[in-house]
């Protein structure tokens, strides 16, 4: 049955945009807010949206069929901007006497990417001004596998650009300048499936190197971080398709890195047409249309905007569970996101492999640093009572250690094993060791006991924040891969409290970290 065209209105931040979408895009009109100087001013942006929204919508509707529904960006975003769009959408829906549909902005980026690529079950890197997230579909929702712990990559780049007096938006200008640059070392912050950009931006601002070198290195470092956590998500989920969405996705170097990584993993990669990458009304209209087909409409009285609306809060009624999604097979069981593991004579050799997408100097630095740190911290964790493999030999890129003949925790999740895992992590944190990558792939189960492996991102810290981030990584993985995540998290917490005196303070911090990611 033919649905008919849906009107979509986007206005979460910079761009006021509207579109009409039927089986394909009919018309798209955008009118972005451009500040005189500095970054976005929410009230000024809202005033801009209010001043142009009527003309933008009139231009979209002129000469086209009357929409059968009105969709609008309900969140996340800037409250003043969202309220302008929400008010207009309600008025139009009542005027046309058609259904109203509230669309999650992040989910809309994912759905327009799926439409443009034809991919069915991809991992999605969403890289924009305010958001940096790696998402994928599981059990009726889009799960967030990893995300920024501080600011979005686009905002990070724009902050650096403003500090150097570069015009807005800063991303294209930095990309242009970077073409003539050379690499200089800058901070690289990846914490399991999450990442952080504030330290990188601060170091780039303070760097005394030529501007072209700093721009080049800022891109090389930030985009390598994004590519690394995206590869982890592909490895963790066993998915074989990747889509890049969001305004930062227009950067050719980021596209090149992701394409290179996917080629090495035999994964398919797609980037939508530029008109679908940044914030746009087409993604709202298209997502509204698929939601309308599944009956996901809003009564006007329940259409309040939500500035903190996360993608994983949306019940995805318009998709079916892909076949095999319960198993999440990892086609790279012998080759994870960072290393190849070879087994021989009761030993496991973990060999860190070079990544073609990373700058060679950065690649060598990370391999050497992570190999040395891993060997040292495995030994320290073992002294603290944590079950880890015994180290036998170390080289520049290889650790030879005892082979633990077990299965990954992700393949046998249970409350009993998560409670045991909590006790183990409690011992680790009590010894002031932070693992840095507490995913369910890095716990092995052998004879009913859990063993902790892969200390490549580990470090020492007595900081509450660092230990909270450690647990946040694990909780994110549980939420994105298990329908019983709440039960499993409670079991972990019970075990953790047994061994970690500061457990409540750390767990409260983990909750604060989760809330920070609502809209950054």
UniProtKB/Swiss-Prot annotation:
Q: Which residues bind L-threonylcarbamoyladenylate?
A: 126-130, 158, 171, 175, 251
Q: Give the EC number.
A: 2.3.1.234, 2.7.11.1
Main subcellular location of this protein, as a coarse class: cytoplasm
Question: What Gene Ontology cellular component terms go with this record?
Answer: cytoplasm; EKC/KEOPS complex
Task: Please give the Gene Ontology molecular function terms for this protein.
Answer: ATP binding; iron ion binding; metalloendopeptidase activity; N(6)-L-threonylcarbamoyladenine synthase activity; protein serine kinase activity; protein serine/threonine kinase activity; protein serine/threonine/tyrosine kinase activity; zinc ion binding
Pfam entry (one): RIO1
InterPro entries linked = ATPase_NBD (IPR043129), Bud32 (IPR022495), Gcp-like_dom (IPR000905), KAE1/TsaD (IPR017861), Kae1_archaea_euk (IPR034680), Kinase-like_dom_sf (IPR011009), Peptidase_M22_CS (IPR017860), Prot_kinase_dom (IPR000719)
Superkingdom in the source lineage = Archaea
Q: Where, by residue number, does Fe cation bind?
A: 105, 109, 126, 279
List of catalytic residues: 437
Q: Which reaction does it catalyse?
A: L-seryl-[protein] + ATP = O-phospho-L-seryl-[protein] + ADP + H(+); L-threonyl-[protein] + ATP = O-phospho-L-threonyl-[protein] + ADP + H(+); L-threonylcarbamoyladenylate + adenosine(37) in tRNA = N(6)-L-threonylcarbamoyladenosine(37) in tRNA + AMP + H(+)
The cofactor named in the record is: Fe(2+)
UniProt domain Protein kinase: residue ranges: 327-520
Instruction: Output the GO biological process annotations, alphabetical, semicolon-separated.
Output: tRNA threonylcarbamoyladenosine modification
User: What top-level class of enzyme does the UniProt entry assign?
Assistant: transferase
Its biological purpose: Required for the formation of a threonylcarbamoyl group on adenosine at position 37 (t(6)A37) in tRNAs that read codons beginning with adenine. Is a component of the KEOPS complex that is probably involved in the transfer of the threonylcarbamoyl moiety of threonylcarbamoyl-AMP (TC-AMP) to the N6 group of A37. The Kae1 domain likely plays a direct catalytic role in this reaction. The Bud32 domain probably displays kinase activity that regulates Kae1 function.
Q: So what family is this one in?
A: In the N-terminal section; belongs to the KAE1 / TsaD family. In the C-terminal section; belongs to the protein kinase superfamily. Tyr protein kinase family. BUD32 subfamily.
Assembly and interactions?
Component of the KEOPS complex that consists of Kae1, Bud32, Cgi121 and Pcc1; the whole complex dimerizes.
Q: What is this protein called?
A: Probable bifunctional tRNA threonylcarbamoyladenosine biosynthesis protein
């Amino acid at each position: 049955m033919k649905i008919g065209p849906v009107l979509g209105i986007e206005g979460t931040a910079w761009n006021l945009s509207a579109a009409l979408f039927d089986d394909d895009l009919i018309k798209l009109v955008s009118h972005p807010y451009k500040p005189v100087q500095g970054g976005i001013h929410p009230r000024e942006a809202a005033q801009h949206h209010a001043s142009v929204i009527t003309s933008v919508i009139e231009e979209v509707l002129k000469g086209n069929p009357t929409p059968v529904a009105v969709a609008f960006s309900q969140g996340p975003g800037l409250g003043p901007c969202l309220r302008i769009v929400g008010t207009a959408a309600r008025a139009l829906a009542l005027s046309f006497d058609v259904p109203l549909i509230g669309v999650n902005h992040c989910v809309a980026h994912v759905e327009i990417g799926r439409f443009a690529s034809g991919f069915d079950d991809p991992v999605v890197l969403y890289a924009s001004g305010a958001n940096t997230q790696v998402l994928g579909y599981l059990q009726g929702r889009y799960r967030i596998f990893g995300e920024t712990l501080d600011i979005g990559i686009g905002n990070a780049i724009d902050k650096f650009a403003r500090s150097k007096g570069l015009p807005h938006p800063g991303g294209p200008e930095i990309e242009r300048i970077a073409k003539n640059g050379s690499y200089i070392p800058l901070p690289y912050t990846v914490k399991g499936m999450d990442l952080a950009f504030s330290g990188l931006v601060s170091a780039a601002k303070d760097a005394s190197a030529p501007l072209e070198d700093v721009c080049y290195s800022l891109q090389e470092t930030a985009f390598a971080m994004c590519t690394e956590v995206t590869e982890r998500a592909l490895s963790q989920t066993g998915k074989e398709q990747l889509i890049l969405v969001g305004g930062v996705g227009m950067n050719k170097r980021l596209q090149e890195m992701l394409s290179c990584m996917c080629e090495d993993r035999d994964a398919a990669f797609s980037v939508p047409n530029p008109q679908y990458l940044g914030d746009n009304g087409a993604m709202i209209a298209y997502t509204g249309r698929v939601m309308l087909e599944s009956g996901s409409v809003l009564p006007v009285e329940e259409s309040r905007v939500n500035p903190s609306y996360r993608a994983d809060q949306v019940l995805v009624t318009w998709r079916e569970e892909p076949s095999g999604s319960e198993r999440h097979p990892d086609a790279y069981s012998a080759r994870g996101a960072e290393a190849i593991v070879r087994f021989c004579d009761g030993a496991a050799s973990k060999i860190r492999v070079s990544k073609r997408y990373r700058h060679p100097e950065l690649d060598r630095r990370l391999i050497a640093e992570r190999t040395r740190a891993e060997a040292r911290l495995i030994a320290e964790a073992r002294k603290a009572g944590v079950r880890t493999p015994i180290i036998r030999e170390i080289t520049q890129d290889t650790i030879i250690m005892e082979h633990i003949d077990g299965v990954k925790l992700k393949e046998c999740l249970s409350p009993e094993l998560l409670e045991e895992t909590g006790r183990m992590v409690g011992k680790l944190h009590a010894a002031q060791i932070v693992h840095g990558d507490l995913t369910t792939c890095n716990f092995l189960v052998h004879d009913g006991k859990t063993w902790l492996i892969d200390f490549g991102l580990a470090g020492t810290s007595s900081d509450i924040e660092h230990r909270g981030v450690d647990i946040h990584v694990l909780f994110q993985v549980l939420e994105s891969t298990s329908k019983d995540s709440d039960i499993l998290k409670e079991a972990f917490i019970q075990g953790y409290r047994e061994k970690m005196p500061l457990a409540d303070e750390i767990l409260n911090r983990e909750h604060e970290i989760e809330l920070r990611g609502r809209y950054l």
